[in-house]
């Protein structure tokens, strides 16, 4: 019975994909969203079938400086919200060695509001801009397997530049380049105590933004989760976090701040709820991460609210 419950709970956990968040790289920003890879039991394969998911991602932060639209911006304050709608399909025994395979498609609508200062030959000027539009879509594929008491998952996410982008705008929902993220997740879950430990390292590669001649560097990220599951009560709680580091320099004529390598560390609480009224078909995840350490990036807080329904 407990394994059945776990199978229903994890139906949302393979659905969490990164969207446009503000980090290092161009405008100190990246496709990687902290806390998106390791939530609750990320390595455990979900049941076969189709799942619809809605994710709401929040970020509010500040940075001393970054480059946007070919100009150096200082004293930056940004507020970001994304509403991501997606669908996944899970095949229990795929042709890939008989292991569970999942694919998914996600399309976001985002709102970005930025305030900053720009220096010109005529002095410094305060700027502000906001926009709401379609964001960059995500395609993903995940392969699950188990060895002993450890569950594993490898995921490849492709970020497609379908979002709105204008070079000289201060705020853009789209990023105008492709991103490729490979993540490997591991989960240990003790079914008697309900204690879970998960780890999810990953690496992100970016193509060049041809409009600004800005090549964002390669990004390494690792996420961790220590969770406690209460199977009979239909919920779980956890302490979760992330470490992020840019491992290669930004480049191109648009990289006016040089290498601009960024790094960050954050941690915070999370809760998973599978309401009994949903008969195991509905799962809700809420999460809030506090940015504790940062360099060359917007620093602030990250929020997630995810609702999924298995058809």
Which residue ranges define each predicted feature?
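Short loop/turn motifs that connect adjacent beta-strands in outer-membrane beta-barrel proteins
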Residues: 25-27, 41-49, 91-101, 116, ...
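Surface-exposed strand-loop-strand hairpins of Gram-negative outer-membrane beta-barrel proteins
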Residues: 25-31, 58-82, 118-130
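Outer membrane beta-barrel transmembrane domains
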Residues: 28, 32, 210-311
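Extracellular loop and loop/strand-boundary signature of outer-membrane beta-barrel proteins
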Residues: 39, 69-75, 122-128, 166-172, ...
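Residues on the lipid-exposed face of transmembrane beta-strands in outer-membrane beta-barrel proteins
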Residues: 42, 54, 85-91, 138-145, ...
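Transmembrane beta-barrel strands of outer-membrane/channel proteins
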Residues: 52-60, 103-109, 154-160, 199-205, ...
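Residues that define the transmembrane beta-barrel architecture of outer-membrane proteins
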Residues: 77-85, 99, 128-137, 174-180, ...
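Detector for outer-membrane/organellar transmembrane beta-barrel domains
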Residues: 151-157, 164-251, 273
């Amino acid at each position: 019975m407990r394994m059945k419950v776990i199978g229903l709970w994890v139906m949302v956990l393979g659905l969490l994909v990164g969207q446009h968040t503000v980090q290092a790289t161009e405008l100190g920003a990246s496709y990687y969203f902290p806390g998106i890879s390791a939530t609750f039991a990320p390595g455990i394969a979900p049941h076969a079938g189709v799942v619809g998911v809605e994710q709401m991602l929040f970020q509010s932060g500040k940075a001393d400086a970054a480059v946007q639209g070919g100009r150096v911006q200082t004293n930056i304050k940004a507020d970001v919200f994304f509403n991501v709608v997606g669908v996944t399909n899970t095949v229990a025994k795929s042709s890939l060695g008989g292991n569970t395979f999942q694919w998914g498609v996600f399309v976001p609508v985002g709102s970005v509001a930025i305030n900053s200062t720009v220096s010109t030959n005529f002095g410094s000027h305060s700027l502000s801009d906001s926009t709401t539009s379609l964001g960059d879509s995500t395609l993903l594929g995940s392969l699950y397997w188990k060895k002993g008491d450890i569950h594993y998952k490898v995921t490849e996410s492709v970020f497609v530049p379908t979002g709105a982008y204008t070079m000289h705008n201060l705020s853009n929902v789209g990023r105008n380049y492709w991103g490729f993220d490979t993540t490997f997740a591991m989960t240990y879950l003790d079914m008697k105590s309900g204690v879970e430990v998960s780890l999810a390292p990953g690496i992100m590669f970016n193509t060049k933004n041809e409009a600004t001649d800005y090549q964002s560097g390669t990004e390494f990220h690792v996420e961790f989760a220590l969770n406690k599951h209460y199977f009979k009560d239909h919920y779980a709680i956890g302490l979760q976090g992330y470490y992020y580091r840019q491992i290669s320099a930004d480049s191109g004529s648009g990289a006016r701040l040089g290498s601009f390598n960024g790094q960050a560390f954050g941690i915070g609480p999370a809760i998973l709820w599978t309401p009994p009224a949903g008969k195991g078909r509905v799962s809700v995840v809420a999460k809030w991460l506090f940015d504790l350490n940062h360099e060359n990036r917007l620093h602030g807080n990250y929020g997630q609210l995810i609702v999924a329904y298995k058809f």
